Amino acid sequence: MRVNITLACTECGDRNYITKKNKRNNPERIELKKYCPRLKRVTLHRETK
């Protein structure tokens, strides 16, 4: 079951990325290092509802 998720920057709170994940393989929340355009650097992005 693939669902759409939003990734939000942990430092500024902006929701910068939309992606999909498989809930069966990854039931926990995803954390990825992605580029934040507001801070102009790579930061940790977490899955939000």
Swiss-Prot record:
Keywords: Ribonucleoprotein, Ribosomal protein. GO terms for biological process: translation. InterPro entries: Ribosomal_bL33 (IPR001705), Ribosomal_bL33_CS (IPR018264), Ribosomal_bL33_sf (IPR038584), Ribosomal_zn-bd (IPR011332). GO terms for cellular component: cytoplasm; ribonucleoprotein complex; ribosome. GO terms for molecular function: structural constituent of ribosome. Gene3D superfamilies: Ribosomal protein L33 (2.20.28.120). PANTHER family: 50S RIBOSOMAL PROTEIN L33, CHLOROPLASTIC (PTHR43168), LARGE RIBOSOMAL SUBUNIT PROTEIN BL33C (PTHR43168:SF2). Belongs to the bacterial ribosomal protein bL33 family. This is Large ribosomal subunit protein bL33B. It comes from Bacillus cytotoxicus (strain DSM 22905 / CIP 110041 / 391-98 / NVH 391-98). The gene is rpmG2.
